[in-house]
Amino acid sequence: MSSLVARHRGLLALSTRETHRVLKLWTQTVAAPILSSFLFIAVFGLSLGGRIKHIDGVPYEIFIVPGLVTMAMIQAAYGNNSASVFQARFDRYLNDVVAAPMRSWEVNLGLSIGGVVRALLIGGGLLLLSLPLVDVPVHHPLELMVAVALALTLFASFGVVVGIYATSWDHTAFVTNIVILPLTFLGGVFYSVDLLPSPWHEISHVNPIFYLLNAVRYGFLGTSDVSVALSLAVTGVLAAAMVAWSSWLFRTGHRLKP
């Protein structure tokens, strides 16, 4: 065990640093996103729950929770890592990390851990906070864990990639506001895509976040707009591609070398 720790000392130190960065500012990194997402559950769930009784046999106030939890988690995973990596580049700290005797996958994993930890804290905290309002079941825990793992891998690595390519803070925010947020809302957070008329129903199936949301919703509620196998496959392929991309950036030093 001690020899294993010694071999991966750099990974452990980098992961600890990124995790400490999240916990040090927990009121901003964890508490604030939980509160803002909880307001969605309270306002939309309680106000519309009386008008929209059920979707796919599930009460509306329960139906929206998995989507809102997923939205909060993927935004946290992306936002944390894109900001952390961009700041590390700006401070030239990342040059020291890349120059250290660490494998590319260790650097990639170490920088991604902070976003994953932050996302899990937000997701767990949001579920706990929503318990007095809604009782969200977990029908398929294995599928849920796989879906969450793939989703966080995808967006944590995506955050690393954007953090490397970004040349200003505006670029990291642009991806959140113009790409992630619209695709998340259009992916079916507040509704079932099956309710949409053509051609919007077909267009929604091009949205990658649609598959991610449905995989998580299936894990919680046992209902999905598309096959859970297809949802996990699409999310898994995208996650693998993003990990490969971010690892390649560290292996080659592309956009990292001064």
Regions found by a protein language model. Name each.
Residues M1-L142, V146-P258:
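Hydrophobic transmembrane alpha-helices and immediately adjacent juxtamembrane helices
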